[in-house]
Amino acid sequence: MYSSNIKTIRACNGMLFVFYYSQGSIFFVKIHKGSSSASVKIADNASPMFSVWCTDNGIYIMFNGDQGTVLCFYNYSRWVSRIIAKDLGESCSRISFFTDGESVHLLYSIKNINSNTESLFIRSMKKDKWEQPKKVSDIMPFPNTPYFIGRENNDKIKIYYRISDKTIKYRSLNLCDGNMTEAENLLATSMPCYDISILTKNDESHILYLAQGMYSSQLIYKGIKSGRQIKARVIWEGQLSGSCLLFCNNGRLYALMYLSLIHI
């Protein structure tokens, strides 16, 4: 998914699609073999931020309009659209979009009034029929996002979130049937989160957590392999702050940390 107001998608047939926002409307242009089509308007009264997703069957666009959240689908011959939610609006802090065959899934987080918590929901469409939203959990957002997503395989994703007692949990979502596993604990720490990085690889989950205390900071690692929990361990500690990143290269797991000195 993308979050700027101009984006491109290359379809399976090799055709390039350019989508852009202008003066309250969303347009697209088709480019093929060096020639471009005229601009075609997709929607009016749209917000500048919209998301685009491409599948073998066509292209999806999701945006907020004056009537609610709208999902448009293009089957490479015509556009169809429908309102999928009327009550998200500005209360929605993040929304993610997934497809698998005839199934479509929306994962979104709603801010709770007069609280630092949010509520995480999943809503699925099967064979052109939308089901009622299902609540995943009440969550406490991370510093830069309410939740994280990792892909186990083509049919499953993992949803990572934090609850009010600062425990980080995860649930697996089957994109084919929309079923979710029960919540599992990933990491529990009482120290405030400064930065976090989560990596999903097949049935493995790895988390790097930069916790900042009053007098020192800790970089904590924990992993899950084949359903077996690896004991959390502190791999760095000191009076520094910064950001952290997990990545995999040639079968090896690396932890990267950018440090900035704290002046006391």
Predicted feature locations:
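Extracellular, repeat-based ectodomains that mediate carbohydrate processing or recognition
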Residues: 1-262
